[in-house]
């Protein structure tokens, strides 16, 4: 049975030769070189992923939604009742939430995964429960390190099993009342930013309660003393099992050489953890949308990422990842279906990248 260490060790590097071939092919298509902008760079990124066999392509698509409750909810950092996590997880199994509608439109399957809901098991939800809710990070760690490591491995294996069954494009999502608080704590730790710079309103927290949320994040960091150079330490101390789960999807997809679409702020925090745990993950991550949550810009700057969509969204669930899946498919369609300059006897002047 593969260990977490072995999984991380076996993440492949991008295929530079395949990327060079893809760039050459794209430059010969019926358009001025570079005129399709980031669609071209996305196609080249995909071509370098070993799991796609040297060419941009999309097979089956899946959005993995990690669901959990958080002890820090008790600190007054969220307005929604804790039971909403379980209710919405059940709604996801019926296909009625935001991510389900957007994923269906994109032709993707939503996998609803219970990694720590504080309720009885829900029919139709995948059971990977670590505990009924995370610890309250304002008074102690969210979980033990061994729990975090075990969940990272379990989710990574689940992701790789989906890859073996034909999934070639993953999206990550989450569901959990109060989970923007641990996400903000993680972003604060990884980027060295003060809590005031990264704490936002989450699911419509009133402005009058923001200062309390900032204080809770500061207390969580002060009490737990997470090591910013140790991604698992940060996840286990000030994160949450839903954030660990998303990190596991990223590690598993990268191990299989396949792309992962990030969602919003919660996924940025998980991406920071994934890249700290295994820097080789970074080339497999694709940013979908620019979250409207306050700390988004800081997190994305630290990841050196520019999302493809600016939609003022902050729902979470993986909604942005689902919405961006057609962009990935468009990059593949461009690569495979456009005609070539040579076939039409068109010769463009050297350096002509902006005009037809």
Swiss-Prot record:
<dbReference type="InterPro" id="IPR017846">
    <property type="entry name" value="Nict_dMeBzImd_PRibTrfase_bact"/>
</dbReference>
<keyword id="KW-0808">Transferase</keyword>
<comment type="similarity">
    <text>Belongs to the CobT family.</text>
</comment>
<dbReference type="GO" id="GO:0009236">
    <property type="term" value="P:cobalamin biosynthetic process"/>
</dbReference>
<dbReference type="GO" id="GO:0008939">
    <property type="term" value="F:nicotinate-nucleotide-dimethylbenzimidazole phosphoribosyltransferase activity"/>
</dbReference>
<keyword id="KW-0169">Cobalamin biosynthesis</keyword>
<comment type="pathway">
    <text>Nucleoside biosynthesis; alpha-ribazole biosynthesis; alpha-ribazole from 5,6-dimethylbenzimidazole: step 1/2.</text>
</comment>
<protein>
    <recommendedName>
        <fullName>Nicotinate-nucleotide--dimethylbenzimidazole phosphoribosyltransferase</fullName>
        <ecNumber>2.4.2.21</ecNumber>
    </recommendedName>
</protein>
<keyword id="KW-0328">Glycosyltransferase</keyword>
<dbReference type="InterPro" id="IPR036087">
    <property type="entry name" value="Nict_dMeBzImd_PRibTrfase_sf"/>
</dbReference>
<dbReference type="InterPro" id="IPR023195">
    <property type="entry name" value="Nict_dMeBzImd_PRibTrfase_N"/>
</dbReference>
<feature type="active site" description="Proton acceptor">
    <location>
        <position position="317"/>
    </location>
</feature>
<dbReference type="Pfam" id="PF02277">
    <property type="entry name" value="DBI_PRT"/>
</dbReference>
<dbReference type="InterPro" id="IPR003200">
    <property type="entry name" value="Nict_dMeBzImd_PRibTrfase"/>
</dbReference>
<comment type="function">
    <text>Catalyzes the synthesis of alpha-ribazole-5'-phosphate from nicotinate mononucleotide (NAMN) and 5,6-dimethylbenzimidazole (DMB).</text>
</comment>
<comment type="subunit">
    <text>Homodimer.</text>
</comment>
């Amino acid at each position: 049975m593969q260990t977490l260490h072995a999984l991380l060790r076996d993440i492949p590097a991008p295929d530079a030769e395949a990327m060079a071939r893809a760039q050459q092919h794209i430059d010969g298509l019926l358009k001025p070189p570079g005129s399709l902008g980031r669609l071209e760079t996305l196609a080249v990124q995909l071509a370098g992923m070993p799991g796609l066999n040297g060419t941009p392509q999309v097979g089956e698509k899946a959005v993995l939604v990690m669901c959990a409750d958080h002890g820090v909810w008790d600190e007054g950092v969220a307005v929604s009742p804790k039971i909403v996590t379980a209710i919405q997880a059940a709604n996801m199994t019926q296909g009625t939430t935001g991510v389900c509608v957007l994923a269906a439109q994109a032709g993707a399957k939503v996998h609803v995964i219970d990694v720590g809901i504080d309720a009885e098991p829900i029919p139709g939800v995948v059971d990977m429960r670590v505990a009924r809710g995370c610890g309250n990070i304002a008074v102690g760690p969210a979980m033990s390190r061994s729990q975090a490591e075990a969940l990272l491995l379990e989710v990574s294996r689940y992701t790789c099993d989906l890859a073996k069954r034909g999934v070639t494009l993953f999206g990550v999502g989450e569901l959990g009342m109060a989970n923007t608080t641990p996400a903000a704590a993680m972003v604060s730790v990884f980027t060295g930013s003060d809590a005031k710079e990264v704490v936002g309103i989450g699911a419509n927290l009133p402005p009058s309660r923001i200062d309390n949320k900032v204080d809770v994040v500061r207390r969580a960091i002060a009490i737990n003393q997470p090591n910013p150079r140790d991604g698992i330490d940060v996840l286990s101390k000030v994160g949450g099992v839903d954030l660990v789960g998303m990190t596991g999807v990223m590690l598993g997809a990268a191990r299989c050489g396949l792309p992962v679409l990030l969602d919003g702020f919660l996924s940025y925090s998980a991406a920071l953890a994934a890249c700290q745990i295994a820097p080789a993950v970074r080339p497999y991550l694709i940013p979908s949308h620019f979250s409207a949550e306050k700390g988004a810009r800081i997190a994305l700057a630290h990841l050196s990422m520019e999302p493809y969509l600016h939609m003022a969204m902050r729902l979470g669930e993986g909604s942005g990842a689902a919405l961006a899946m057609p962009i990935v498919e468009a990059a593949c369609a461009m690569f495979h279906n456009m005609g070539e300059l040579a076939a039409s006897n068109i010769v463009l002047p050297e350096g002509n990248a902006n005009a037809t």
